[in-house]
Structures are given as structure tokens and as C-alpha cells.
């Protein structure tokens, strides 16, 4: 009985630990549930491609920069955390021959410090170029629905990759509506992106400590 209760406590700890991770499902994968808000006509002009592995751009990415394609896949499957992804970026920076590209990647690495993934990687695509409008910066402004957003999330941002320019950026949303779980952003056509936010380090530590205490109390009670 003592051993059985101890394992029950450990199982509870495992469940709670998974709950501390942003957007992680029961099988360990990260959610890609991101869509263009359907309350306006923008959903007829733009779309979010969730199955990026099926796109021609991703197939090309696997040939030109396989490390990035593999990282996108692993992040979405929940097999790579942000630290692991940052290591991939560090390698890209070391191998970069263009100093501008190298500096941009290093800047992104700095901005990712203390962050965590909220979603897996998806792709933004313009469906109707005739109706689509660019802003002053040459980007498309769109409101997206992100159900995995919570009130507790702080400093929500997007990590973006433009395959055509090989540019990595961390961008701030134009607006965030946590109540309706929507984000307004400005994106490049065909860019890949993931939602990130401040990591819940304290929450994870508290959960671990609570689980350990539960295990100890269960054992002592026996």
C-alpha cells in the first residue's frame, strides 16, 4: 500500500508538471491551434497553415536548411524546448558568413532568454493578394485566434522566420486580447512563426516542490 500510494503521488506530480508547460497536449506535442479570426473578412484574405510539413516551402527548407526544418518539427512535437532551439540558432550564427545575418540571429537569441514556447510552428499565408494590403513597413496586419493564451501569460511575442530573406525576428503584437484570446500582428507573407511568452519557472518549481512534499507526506502517513 505504501509503495502504491507513493507511485500515485509521483504520477500526480507528472501530470501537474505537464500542466505547467504552455500549450502541451497529453501526447507531449505543442498546439498549432492558431487561425485567422473569422469575425471579419480577413479570414478570406489570409490563412494560418498548421500542417507546415505539407507545404512546398517546408520541403525546400528541409533541403536548404535541414537543421531549421528539423527544429520546427521537434518543437511542434514537444521534443525540443526553447533551450534546445536556441542551441540550433547559436550554430546558425556561428556558421553565418554574412555579419548582418549573424548579428540578427544573436539578437534573437538574447531576446529568447527567459522565454518558453506557447505553440508549435505554423505559417502565415496570403490567399488573396489582390485584396491584401501592406502597412507602411511592407507587412500584412492580421488578427489571429490563439486559444492557448491565458491571463497568466506575460510578454507574449512571436518568433518569426522568413525563409526568403533568412531573417529571424522576435516581434511584439500590435494588440493582445487575452479575454477573447486573439492577437493582432504584422507579418510577412509565408513566414513561419511560433507564439512565445515568459517562462513559468517559478510555477514549475512550486509544482515540483509540492509533488515532493505530497510524496513525503504519503510515505510518512504509512
Give short role names for the model-derived ranges.
Residues 132-196, 200:
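Proteolytic-maturation and junctional protease-sensitive modules
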Residues 2-6, 10, 19-119, 132-150, ...:
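Feature for mature exported/ectodomain regions
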Residues 119-129:
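Short beta-strand elements of extracellular/lumenal beta-sandwich folds
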Residues 13:
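Active/ligand-binding-proximal structured segments within catalytic/core domains
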Residues 2, 10, 128-130, 171, ...:
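Residue-level detector of functional hotspots within protein domains
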Amino acid at each position: 500500500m505504501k509503495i502504491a500510494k507513493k507511485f500515485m503521488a509521483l504520477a500526480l506530480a507528472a501530470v501537474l508538471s505537464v500542466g505547467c508547460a504552455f500549450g502541451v497536449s497529453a501526447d507531449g506535442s505543442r498546439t498549432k491551434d492558431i487561425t485567422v479570426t473569422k469575425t471579419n473578412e480577413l479570414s478570406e484574405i489570409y490563412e494560418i497553415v498548421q500542417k507546415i510539413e505539407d507545404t512546398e516551402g517546408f520541403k525546400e527548407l528541409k533541403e536548404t536548411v535541414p537543421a531549421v526544418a528539423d527544429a520546427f518539427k521537434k518543437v511542434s512535437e514537444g521534443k525540443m524546448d526553447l533551450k534546445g532551439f536556441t542551441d540550433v540558432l547559436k550554430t546558425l550564427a556561428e556558421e553565418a558568413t554574412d555579419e548582418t545575418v549573424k548579428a540578427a540571429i544573436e539578437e534573437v537569441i538574447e531576446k529568447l532568454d527567459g522565454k518558453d514556447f506557447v505553440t508549435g510552428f505554423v505559417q502565415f499565408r496570403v490567399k488573396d493578394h489582390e485584396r491584401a494590403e501592406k502597412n507602411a513597413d511592407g507587412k500584412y496586419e492580421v488578427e489571429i485566434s490563439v486559444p492557448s493564451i491565458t491571463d497568466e501569460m506575460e510578454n507574449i511575442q512571436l518568433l518569426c522566420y522568413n525563409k526568403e530573406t533568412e531573417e529571424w525576428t522576435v516581434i511584439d503584437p500590435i494588440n493582445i486580447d487575452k479575454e477573447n484570446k486573439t492577437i493582432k500582428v504584422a507579418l510577412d507573407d509565408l513566414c513561419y512563426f511560433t507564439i512565445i511568452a515568459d517562462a513559468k519557472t517559478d510555477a514549475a518549481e512550486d509544482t515540483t516542490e509540492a509533488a515532493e512534499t505530497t510524496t513525503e507526506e504519503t510515505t510518512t502517513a504509512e
